Amino acid sequence: MQDILPIHFAPLQGYTEAFYRNAHAACFGGIDSYYTPFVRLEKDGFRNKDVREIAPESNQVPHLVPQLIAPSIEKAETILSLFIEKGYKEADINLGCPFPLLAKRHNGSGILPYPDEVKTLLGLTLKYPQISFSVKMRLGWDNPDECLQLAPILNDLPLRHITMHPRLGKQQYKGSVDLNGFDAFLNVCQHPLIYNGDINCPDDVHRIRQQFPALAGVMIGRGL
């Protein structure tokens, strides 16, 4: 067990924008990595707001990782090209977004029931070895076993870490986190694993850390 557990600042769409991240870093600090809300393609182009949000000159935090969401490697590659243009050497791939309008098009957690599509999408990590990739995901869309079926694919990839939110996509943010499902994935995951979900106070961090001492870190959203 690490003496100090790394804390990752979760990307919350519509909330954790650049000014919020900058203010948090200036007033509180203590965060190992900040993540941008996902960048996506809209009508085959970028939203101006997304481009502004990831611009290095807009961000004054110690360590910022841009996140992308896409249903295909072609779209993911287009987004990654923007990150590279801006000088980033890391990228987080969103396989966790639960919002139905995106998920039904196999974005975010909507792609989790389709292992072949996940494998093709994450081929991005092999095509760009100069980029350090991570993945943020859920247990599945319909079934917590979906992540277990994806484990062999994920284990074969050069990922920096995986962040797991132990709910199903169809739950969105309702119901309880499935800690048994998280434990099952932890036991088959060969990458450093970060826990995300329902961490609202230091006691929650302590409880999760005691239950899962092998954790590589925690990602906190609303609790920050």
Q: How would you describe each model-predicted region?
A:
Residues 1-224:
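Flavin-dependent oxidoreductase catalytic cores
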